[in-house]
Amino acid sequence: TEESWKHCYDTFKGQGKIVMLNLLKYKPMADYTGMTVSNTQKDKTGKETYQYYLKQVEKIFENTKVGNILYYGESQDFLIGPQDEKWDAVILVEYASLDVFVDFVKSEAYQKVTGHRKASLEDSRLLPASNFNIQEVEK
């Protein structure tokens, strides 16, 4: 929502590097209904389509150096957390700053591929985080 973007911006503006934690729940099959996206992954699973999307994002990162995928892997049931909440995968993406992330999301290159993300996911969560300087944490 617009309110959550404003809160994120107010919280992380000027704090340097941020890491975005993504929790992903794939659709059984990709669904492009109502979307105009080139190179649709028709007859592909949500997981296959998300991985196609991720490869396109990696290409953007390689060309622009705006982000870095730190981790992408399958997830299982929570060890601590709601047992009825199920996620298929987790991805951690690092950006130099919140402004860099916002510029990336608004970029023409990203806008061309973001439909694949929407087509592939049943549900998702995006949680921004910034580093603590462990030396500055009170003991």
Model-derived features: positions:
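Short amphipathic alpha-helices in soluble, non-transmembrane regions
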Residues: 103-110
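A short local loop/turn or secondary-structure capping micro-motif enriched for an aromatic residue
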Residues: 78-79, 111-113
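Charge-dense polyanion-binding interfaces
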Residues: 115-139
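Conserved catalytic core of Hanks-type protein kinase domains
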Residues: 94-95, 104, 120
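Active-site-proximal segments of catalytic enzyme domains
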Residues: 91
